[in-house]
């Protein structure tokens, strides 16, 4: 990358990643990944980081994640379980503390609502609802808007709007998050919008931000003649001047 850090990947005979090493100067940080298929057809993927912390993911024969477990340092396990409908849509996440989140879909299998609940009282399977998000789409099934609500008993308060825009190819050209109760105007959306630009081949060439982050106003992407990403440059804003700085570069073998 731009700081001359090198990331190396290793693979098994099934082209699955088994190791990731990142060299930063004289320090190398490595993660190892292992896979175990049980007699029931389920696969357990274990990721061990440089500190010895282990995360496990169990997937079924359909490739759907049934559970994830953070083993941490071995003293406490934190597990999240997942369930699905007959179409493979995730319909519930259940957390280690007993809280859970539900997912609803329309006839097109588009996500239209999520609801979050606290753990139920002793002997009760349904907890108190705390959050709700609803999603809307255009005629091409592209996500146009999501609205987040905070729930307190029977009272719902709008807390966030997320807006999306697309070009004729269906590529995202605008994304905006607005934390407010009232529906945003077009000007408010524009003021908070991240914008995405593409070349004639549909490759992302630039991302511009409504506000600077660490001085970066935009990111530009460069490609080689084969269409492979070779460089990411940051447009750094300082006082009245703007300069470009390479933040990451990529090389490929033959």
Feature map (PLM): residue ranges:
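Beta-strand elements of repeat-based all-beta scaffolds
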Residues: 1-254
């Amino acid at each position: 990358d731009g700081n001359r850090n090198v990331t190396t990947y290793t693979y098994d005979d099934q082209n699955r990643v088994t190791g990731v090493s990142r060299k930063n100067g004289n320090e190398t940080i490595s993660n190892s990944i292992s896979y175990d298929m049980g007699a029931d057809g389920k696969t357990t993927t274990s990721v061990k980081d440089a500190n010895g912390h282990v995360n496990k993911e169990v997937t079924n024969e359909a490739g759907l994640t049934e559970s994830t477990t953070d083993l941490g340092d071995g003293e406490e396990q934190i597990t999240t379980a997942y369930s699905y409908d007959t179409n493979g849509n995730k319909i519930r996440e259940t957390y280690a503390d007993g809280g859970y989140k539900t997912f609803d879909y329309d006839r097109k299998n588009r996500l239209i609502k999520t609801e979050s609940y606290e753990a139920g009282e002793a002997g009760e399977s349904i907890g108190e609802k705390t959050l709700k998000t609803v999603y809307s789409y255009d005629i091409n099934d592209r996500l146009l808007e999501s609205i987040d609500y905070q729930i307190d008993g029977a009272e719902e308060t709008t807390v966030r709007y997320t807006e999306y825009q697309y070009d004729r190819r269906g590529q995202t050209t605008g994304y905006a998050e607005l934390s407010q109760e009232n529906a945003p105007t077009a000007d408010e959306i524009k003021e908070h919008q991240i914008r995405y630009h593409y070349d004639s081949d549909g490759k992302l060439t630039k991302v511009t931000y409504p506000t600077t982050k660490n001085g970066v106003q935009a990111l530009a992407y460069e490609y080689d003649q084969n269409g492979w990403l070779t460089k990411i440059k940051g447009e750094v804003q300082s006082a009245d001047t703007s300069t470009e700085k390479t933040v990451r570069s990529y090389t490929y073998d033959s």
